[in-house]
Amino acid sequence: MAVLEQTAILTDAIRPVPASELEARLEKFRRLMDGMHPGWEMAAVNHKIAMYYFTGTMQEGVLLIRPQDAIFWVRRNYERAVNESHFSDIRPMHSFREAAAYYG
């Protein structure tokens, strides 16, 4: 029983990553991409730890980053992603084809 109580305490202490921090991380990534790969058009992030770093949640999906925007396409647990994250653009998708179709 004590383990469950400790788990609840730790869970209650977790706070979402602030939106300003998420935006700063994206801007740093874009600056690095501009320096290393001038003219880059899009980067796809699907590794869960990297997704957490950029979005504040690790739901199944893909984060697509372009110089002008970034969209986190969530395949499973969209509601959880929205509840956990302060990322500015989270969209649901049923398959990765939906995200691909958005970009033409």
Residue positions per predicted region:
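Terminal domain-start leader segments
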Residues: M1-F72
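Short, charge-rich binding segments
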Residues: L63, Y102-G104
